[in-house]
Amino acid sequence: MEVEQTSVRSDTNSTCEYLDAEGDPESPNLYQEADPDQEAEQQNHSIISELRDGLGTMRDNSALSPEPGQENKGLAASVESLALSTSTSAKTEDSIGGGLEEEYDYQHDSLWQGQKKHIFILSEAGKPIFSLHGNEDKLATLFGVIQALVSFVQMGQDAITSIHAGGIKFAFMQRSSLILVAASRSNMSVQQLQLQLGDVYNQILSILTYSHMTKIFERRKNFDLRRLLSGSERLFYNLLANDSSSAKVSNNIFTFLTNSIRVFPLPTTIRSQITSAIQSNCSKIKNLVFAVLIANNKLIALVRMKKYSIHPADLRLIFNLVECSESFKSSENWSPICLPKFDMNGYLHAHVSYLADDCQACLLLLSVDRDAFFTLAEAKAKITEKLRKSHCLEAINEELQQPFNAKLYQQVVGIPELRHFLYKPKSTAQLLCPMLRHPYKSLTELERLEAIYCDLLHRIHNSSRPLKLIYEMKEREVVLAWATGTYELYAIFEPVVDKATVIKYVDKLIKWIEKEYDVYFIRNHATF
């Protein structure tokens, strides 16, 4: 059993690689923690309030101390209890019928033992908020153990970050009256699990805002936050269904692991026409902060107000919202959304709609003006009309039907032994990731590929001993990780390829990416 503690720190999910990055700044470690003073300042300052003031718009805005010498015994007992509980205590939603749930004994559910990952969210008072598997109320004992563990460590003016026990990694994150825990049997490192917890925390803030949630817990520490999150459970389940533990074959795991987003591949001329259409119809709308056009969980175009940028973590929340909301396809919607990395204390008001019935690209116009719906609806109609006349809708549809990513292997001519790769420029937070193909299209093989990338990313971004180059000949593949001053490349080759051939192929791949760069990446984002 191994327990890791650390002094109280800030968000491990922070990065300075923003989506409008220009040039090639020195890139921080992927898991680098935020400056506590900077985060505290952000919590007390609202960018949205500042924008509204500038634009002239209106806004409404104890644990008992143990006996001497008993702390370590109590902590060890709690750790043992937590490891035991997460091996035998809960069930999946599908394992028992809803009618029997009230009488079911979670403490003896062997079906849950096969789960590879759990996420638990509770308040500092120990009140259950969310469990990825099982009913929170039926897991009260487990939540109590978690709260006891955190309290033991807090009494020493410290914070617990991870526990390794019973073949399970437990990653902890404490944020603004909340305790978030990931329990995993996968190959993910503690830092990678904390990245995922950071996304979950941001999802909560996107619904409630930091200031509102803080006021609630200041008034009532044992408040049941599920009352305010009711109806949004689908957002959490979908957000967490991004790796093989969800029994889905998907590329989403790679954007989460690299703290990035993917760009919708388009010819440069088409993307420029799309951006121009948004600019020309939105430039005079003073209250508009961001215009985001997405399709298939990828960014087509982003236009922003000068001085303001959007973080990849915030964009992933937008992608998640659109993916989970079928109603957006049938009508125009007006939704408040908090983008925590932009401003954790206030809402932007989003006009959300698909461009047309015959084009499944979704446009979000985010404003600080809560009364701008009709103005933005008119702008959206004009944008759609202009894109139809310039045949941009046809270009988007063609890519949706015959994805560039599916043709990546054919386009990279002469590298038949290349199985898969990830490429991330350090000047952006964007990722090039081809579609999965044989042998990684099955869930079992995806788990293996996921484990390989988790290991490579952890070693490249290890805070104590980061590596620049990794080359390994494994039994079933040859793997390469290479971090230069301008990009990161992770590549998987057939096991028969030797080192000289890998070097030749990597050189060829990099040259091809540089040639096609503007199809798969957005260098700079336009402004209003």
From Swiss-Prot:
- Which stretches does the entry tag as region Disordered? 1-50
Q: Does the keyword Chaperone apply?
A: no
| Consequences of knocking out this gene | Accumulation of autophagosomes and reduced number of autolysosomes in fat cells caused by disruption of Rab7 recruitment to autophagosomes leading to a defect in autophagosome-autolysosome fusion. Impaired lysosomal degradation of endocytosed Notch and Boss receptors in the developing eye.
* GO terms, biological process: endosome to lysosome transport via multivesicular body sorting pathway; neuromuscular junction development; protein targeting to vacuole
> Record's Pfam families?
Fuz_longin_1, Fuz_longin_2, Fuz_longin_3
Q: Note how its activity is modulated.
A: The Rab7 guanyl-nucleotide exchange factor (GEF) activity of the Mon1-Ccz1 complex is autoinhibited by the N-terminal disordered region of Mon1. GEF activity is stimulated by Rab5-mediated recruitment to membranes.
| Compositionally biased tracts (Polar residues) | 1-16
Q: Which GO terms describe its cellular component?
A: cytosol; Mon1-Ccz1 complex; synaptic cleft
What InterPro entries does the record point to? FUZ/MON1/HPS1_longin_1, FUZ/MON1/HPS1_longin_2, FUZ/MON1/HPS1_longin_3, Mon1
Question: Keywords on this record?
Answer: Cytoplasm, Guanine-nucleotide releasing factor, Lipid-binding, Transport
Subcellular locations according to the entry = Cytoplasm, Cytosol
- UniProt GO molecular function: guanyl nucleotide exchange factor inhibitor activity; guanyl-nucleotide exchange factor activity; lipid binding
Cell wall biogenesis/degradation in keyword set = no
Q: How does it assemble?
A: Component of the Mon1-Ccz1 guanyl-nucleotide exchange factor complex made up of Mon1, Ccz1 and Bulli; the interaction of Bulli with the Mon1-Ccz1 heterodimer is mediated via the C-terminal Mic1 domain of Bulli. Mon1 and Ccz1 form a stable complex which displays Rab7 GEF activity with or without Bulli; GEF activity is enhanced by Bulli possibly by improving membrane association of the complex. Interacts with Rab5 and Rab7; preferentially binds GTP-bound Rab5 and GDP-bound Rab7.
State the domain notes.
Answer: The disordered N-terminal is involved in autoinhibition of the Mon1-Ccz1 complex guanyl-nucleotide exchange factor activity.
Report the family membership.
Belongs to the MON1/SAND family.
Q: Tell me, what does this protein do in biology?
A: Part of the Mon1-Ccz1 guanyl-nucleotide exchange factor complex specific for Rab7 that promotes the exchange of GDP to GTP, converting Rab7 from an inactive GDP-bound form into an active GTP-bound form. Plays an important role in membrane trafficking through the secretory apparatus. Required for recruitment of Rab7 to endosomal and autophagosomal membranes to mediate endolysosomal and autolysosomal vesicle maturation. Required for fusion of multivesicular bodies and lysosomes but not their formation or trafficking.
- Name-wise, this protein is Vacuolar fusion protein MON1 homolog
The organism encoding this protein is Drosophila melanogaster (Fruit fly)
From the UniProt record, report the name of the gene that encodes this protein: Mon1
